[in-house]
Every structure is written in structure tokens, then in C-alpha cells.
């Protein structure tokens, strides 16, 4: 019997506020702080966003789901 896609998928949450800018204002590196978690694809089809602690910013910031 064929099995459908897994319901639980592994996602990466990345800090949205700790982006380094170069001289011209272009983003060099975004989201140094990353968390790995799982989500249920059926219950949360949209991208996850959590307030998590960023050790680089040294405060709680918004962490959003990124593509794998």
C-alpha cells in the first residue's frame, strides 16, 4: 500500500531581524540565529512564525520559517 507524504515535516526557523548590511545596504547574511522544529502539515499549512530568543540580538525576536 502506497504511503502519502509524511504529515510531520522538519522546518527551520530563522531570525528575521539580525541581518547584516554592507556599505550599499544590501543584505549580506540574514538570520544567523536558527531553530529546528517540526510542524504538522495538515494543521498548519502556512509558514510558521514564533517569538524566540536570538543570542545574536540578545533579545526575543520574530523567527520565521525558511525554505529547505
UniProtKB/Swiss-Prot annotation:
Q: Which domain of life is it from?
A: Eukaryota
Q: Which GO terms describe its molecular function?
A: structural constituent of ribosome
InterPro entries named among the record's database cross-references: Ribosomal_bL33, Ribosomal_bL33_CS, Ribosomal_bL33_sf, Ribosomal_zn-bd
State the HAMAP family in the record.
Ribosomal_bL33
Family assignment from sequence similarity: Belongs to the bacterial ribosomal protein bL33 family.
> What is the designated name of this protein?
Large ribosomal subunit protein bL33c
Give the keywords, sorted: Plastid, Ribonucleoprotein, Ribosomal protein
Q: Which GO terms describe its cellular component?
A: plastid; ribonucleoprotein complex; ribosome
- List the subcellular locations: Plastid
| Biological process terms in GO annotation | translation
- Its chief place of residence is plastid
Amino acid at each position: 500500500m502506497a504511503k502519502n507524504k509524511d504529515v510531520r515535516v522538519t522546518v527551520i526557523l530563522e531570525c528575521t531581524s539580525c541581518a547584516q548590511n554592507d556599505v550599499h545596504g544590501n543584505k549580506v547574511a540574514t538570520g544567523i540565529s536558527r531553530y529546528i522544529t517540526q510542524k504538522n502539515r495538515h494543521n498548519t499549512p502556512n509558514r510558521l512564525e514564533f517569538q524566540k530568543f536570538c543570542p545574536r540580538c540578545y533579545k526575543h525576536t520574530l523567527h520565521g520559517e525558511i525554505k529547505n
